[in-house]
Amino acid sequence: MINQEVILTKEECQTIIDLNHEFKRSRVHTAQSERALSKSRTSYESIIKSETISDLLLPKLLKYNIISLPEYCNVSRYVEGQWFEKHSDAGYANVHKRRFKTLIVQLSNPNDYKGGELVIWDQNENETISDTAIGNMILFESKLLHQANKIKSGTRYSLVFFLTTDNFKIDKPLI
């Protein structure tokens, strides 16, 4: 199941973008549990402690039974010509074995860039293109294939969390 909803205001998104980020070239996990540069992912990312923004996000995520955030999350930055090819966030068992859901929040105003759509395929290969509204959250199973299309112009920022079952209240059915 894929859930989408606007959960942050324009001002809240800008607050996250304006944090003191140290952007570095994004890396991907390898089968050997290493993080390596790859031609499949050309964006930049800043790893931040989730506690920096948990007070802002958690109250808005409770209805999805999310009761905590992982220790770290990342802010991804895509500029012209950058993308992330089709992949799964639950790729390697030795690295991602606990990833359950992926949560991505669109931080940029969609007028600030062209291209860069987030495309997700469900188990039946049906395609969903994420809403690009500023503050839009998309929550999906980490095993689903997805990609960030190439940015044609401008800059796109997103906030990314990899959730485990530990982050969910489990006395209710999970989404």
Question: Residue locations for each model-derived region?
Answer:
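Catalytic core of non-heme Fe(II) oxygenases with the double-stranded beta-helix
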Residues: D55-I175
